[in-house]
Amino acid sequence: MFDILMYLFENYVHSEVEFLVDEDELTQELTRAGFHQSEIIKALSWLENLAELQEGDTPYLCDHDQHSFRIYTQKEMDKLDVECRGFLLFLEQIKVLSVETREMVIDRVMELDETALILEDLKWVVLMVLFNAPGNESAYEQMEDLIFEQPDGRLHS
């Protein structure tokens, strides 16, 4: 399923090509690209659920204390290792993620089929969430920079 999400993001969203809105056409395109029907359905459902998070009816996206600290469930820790959780905290500290967008990212990660997520895949999920969350254009650009810009030279000496 994640491969399909990446395919859609890279070929339609990120490349700024007009996105096919007809689900049947999109399904046919993905089938021609070699993806299995069951995985296509899961990926499209994942995207629909991401869009539904924007409606604001999700309780954990509404009420929060600015000074609260996120405690991960065991299932979340199984899927997001220490490096991934640390990266999410880093993104919050540099204001790429808000409490709401962080929770959206975690929600979308937990819906993926993968038993554990690597950091590179998490970065793409963050990018997808920010792209689909209105008012986060600046955060999206910052996240793009974190993904695509490679540092010159060594970070530590």
Curated annotation (Swiss-Prot):
Pfam families: DUF494
InterPro entries referenced in this protein's UniProt entry, alphabetically: Smg
Family: Belongs to the Smg family.
UniProt-listed PANTHER family: PROTEIN SMG
Protein name: Protein Smg homolog
Species assigned in the record: Shewanella sediminis (strain HAW-EB3)
